[in-house]
Structure formats: structure tokens, C-alpha cells
Amino acid sequence: MQRGKFITFEGIDGAGKSTHLAWLASFLRDKGLEVIVTREPGSTALGEQLRQLLLDHRQAMHAETETLLMFAARREHLDKVILPALERGAWVISDRFTDASFAYQGGGRGVPSARLEILEQWVQKGFSPDLTVYFDVPVTISRQRVQSARTADRFELEPDLFFERVRQAYLQRAKQFSERIRVVDGSLSLEEVRTAMVEVVEKFWSAQASSGYRM
């Protein structure tokens, strides 16, 4: 049995990840693949409890506490969902993964990258996504989308400056890991974003096929 592939979607709140993630899942299922859709934090019983705690706007917490809870949820996510699915040949698509910690806890909260790297190695033991699609949108557009969509959570209540730091951290990660992270302009129309994402996914798909991966 061939190991499956792990794809992550990243972006600040309001970037449109969820909409495009659903499309990609359908695209891959149409090709006969088993596809597991997950999210962070969450996707396990404990992870969903931690998600509620982390997003609760009534619950203030230290940046390091937030970081440790994120990585605790991630360890459960890996152990209970991601790794078992990949081992049986399924493809896993996650709404956020570790790049989000470097962006939100690192860029946004100011947690040093060195500490995040230690946690990343401890929790993931060298594991990383096969492909990451980062949907980049200006903070002004992000805020407009979030405010019109739902009641704000603890992160969404942060000021614009916080999200600008998060966005810049994401862009820096995209430069640092350009082979894995593909940037899509999320400020374009839905159709234009979809077209750009399809191009990214199809290139990845073709690369897997040419390397001998049996679809």
C-alpha cells in the first residue's frame, strides 16, 4: 500500500480556505482517492475540546500556554487521524497545520521561532506536509469577510496589526519553504482563486505521477 499525501491550506482568517478545501476534496475523490478532511485545532475528541478553549473570547491566556495547547492538539491530530490515514493510502487535507503556529503564535504573539522549532521537532519528529497552499489576502479584505460571516472568536477579535504580523510571518514562511508552500492570491474573485489553486494542485498531481506514484 502506497502512503497517502498530506496537503495543508493556510491563510489568515477570511482567506477563503474552507471553501477551496471542499473543492479540492471533491477533485481528489473524483480521481478515486480516499480523502480525509481535517482542521486545526480539532479533528479529535480532545482536539475539539482544546479548540473550544482556544477560540473562546472569554478565555484569556498567555502566548506560551496558547502555543503549547496548539501543539498538544496537533500531536493528537497526528496520532489519531493524519498518520493512520496516510498509512492506509488516504490523502489528508487539513485546514491549517504547523505553518499556522509560526504565523499566529510566532508572528502574531511573538513566540520565538526557536521555541516553535523545538516543539515542531518534538511533536512531529520530522513530519511535514507534502504540499501547502497559502491563500494570501490583505488584512482589510480579511476583516471585511470575517465581520460579515460570523461572530468573532478570540483570534478574530485581535487588532489589524496582529493580523498584519501574522500575514507577514506567513509570507516569510512561503519564501523559506518555497518548494512546499505555494502562494495563491486570495483577494481575487472566487473563480480566479479556484483557477490558480487548480493549477497548483494539478502540477503537484503531475509531479506525483511522474515520480512513479500510482494514483
Curated annotation (Swiss-Prot):
Catalytic reaction list: dTMP + ATP = dTDP + ADP
Biological process annotations from GO: dTDP biosynthetic process; dTTP biosynthetic process; dUDP biosynthetic process
Source superkingdom: Bacteria
Keywords: ATP-binding, Kinase, Nucleotide biosynthesis, Nucleotide-binding, Transferase
InterPro entries: P-loop_NTPase, Thymidylate_kin-like_dom, Thymidylate_kinase
Record-listed E.C. numbers: 2.7.4.9
Family membership noted in the UniProt record: Belongs to the thymidylate kinase family.
PANTHER family linked: THYMIDYLATE KINASE, UMP-CMP KINASE 2, MITOCHONDRIAL
Function: Phosphorylation of dTMP to form dTDP in both de novo and salvage pathways of dTTP synthesis.
UniProt-recorded name of the protein: Thymidylate kinase
Species per Swiss-Prot/TrEMBL record: Nitrosomonas eutropha (strain DSM 101675 / C91 / Nm57)
